[in-house]
């Protein structure tokens, strides 16, 4: 059965040359999640798609097709383009790459779409990059069914104690440590105080920000596999 969709809100996640004059594109859409499609002739100098198919530009796309890869029938501008520069640009590309790597095609994620849009707006503004990225990573894991529970010990169900240390196991959670490891030498152990700060998205303290980044890298790594994040290779300062 052929799919026909008109004026679907979307953001471009990635594009790559396809055949002589076309582009193979990945979109994150409001109702259909990740959509892979061909934009025919988009690389031609006079193509109407050429200037529109840019990351972080709110779009309205129309597409059709029977198979996994659809055909783009129309692209229109939506709201004003979100402009990201320097580390905020690479942070946005990092977020896009997470979606490409972790989302399946044609699975609806309307809540995540709204969160993605909010993340881009916050990156464009003056909000602290670390807090914006950690919030998105936590929301992404929750949407995929792998929520990180920052409220309690997964075995005892006791509330996280700011004076205790916890061992983190991806996709399971935090378990009270019976020992008192040196946290800087024990990558899987975290301070309860730092976990509470992350829960409240208060990453102003450098040590808390580093712990939060380490935690989310571990939580994501089991789903991303061994292939490195390209945007992290390009810019290692923030993501």
Could you say what each language-model-derived stretch is?
Residues 1-23, 28-239:
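Non-catalytic alpha-helical scaffolds and adjoining flexible linkers that form interface surfaces
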């Amino acid at each position: 059965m052929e799919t026909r969709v008109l004026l679907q809100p979307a953001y471009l996640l990635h594009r790559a040359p396809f055949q002589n004059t076309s582009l193979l594109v990945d979109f994150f859409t409001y109702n259909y999640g990740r959509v892979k499609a061909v934009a025919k002739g988009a690389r031609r100098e006079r193509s109407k798609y050429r200037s529109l198919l840019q990351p972080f530009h709110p779009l309205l796309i129309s597409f059709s097709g029977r198979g996994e890869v659809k055909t783009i029938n129309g692209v229109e501008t939506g709201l004003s383009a979100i402009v990201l520069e320097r580390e905020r640009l690479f942070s946005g590309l990092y977020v896009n790459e997470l979606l490409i790597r972790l989302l399946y095609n044609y699975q609806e994620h309307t809540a995540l779409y709204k969160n993605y849009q909010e993340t881009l707006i916050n990156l464009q503004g003056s909000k602290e990059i670390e807090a914006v990225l950690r919030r998105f990573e936590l929301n992404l894991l929750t949407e995929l069914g792998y929520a990180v529970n920052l409220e309690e010990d997964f075995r005892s169900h006791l509330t996280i104690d700011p004076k205790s240390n916890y061992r983190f196991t991806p996709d399971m959670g935090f378990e009270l440590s019976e020992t008192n490891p040196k946290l800087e030498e024990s990558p899987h152990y975290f301070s309860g105080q730092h976990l509470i700060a992350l829960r409240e998205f208060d990453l102003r303290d450098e040590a808390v920000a580093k712990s939060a980044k380490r935690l989310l890298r571990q939580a994501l790594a089991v789903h991303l596999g061994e292939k490195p994040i390209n945007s992290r290779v390009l810019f290692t300062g923030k993501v």
